[in-house]
């Protein structure tokens, strides 16, 4: 459950904080993934692609840091 405090009736900042917390919790990604049924084989392929993408990103970072 996501809780957001409202200070002095400031709805704009409250809404901004709420959206930020939702993004941090990966709520939008989960909603998008659960919109349609994903077969287990497609899920494995997607997870492998995400892992490969993360490894390439880490390798690029490591290359530039040295």
UniProtKB/Swiss-Prot annotation:
One of its GO terms (cellular component) is ribonucleoprotein complex. GO terms for molecular function: structural constituent of ribosome. It comes from the Bacteria. GO terms for biological process: translation. InterPro entries: Ribosomal_bS21 (IPR001911), Ribosomal_bS21_sf (IPR038380). Keywords: Ribonucleoprotein, Ribosomal protein. The keyword Cell cycle does not apply. The keyword Ribosomal protein applies. Belongs to the bacterial ribosomal protein bS21 family. This is Small ribosomal subunit protein bS21. It comes from Rickettsia canadensis (strain McKiel). The gene is rpsU.
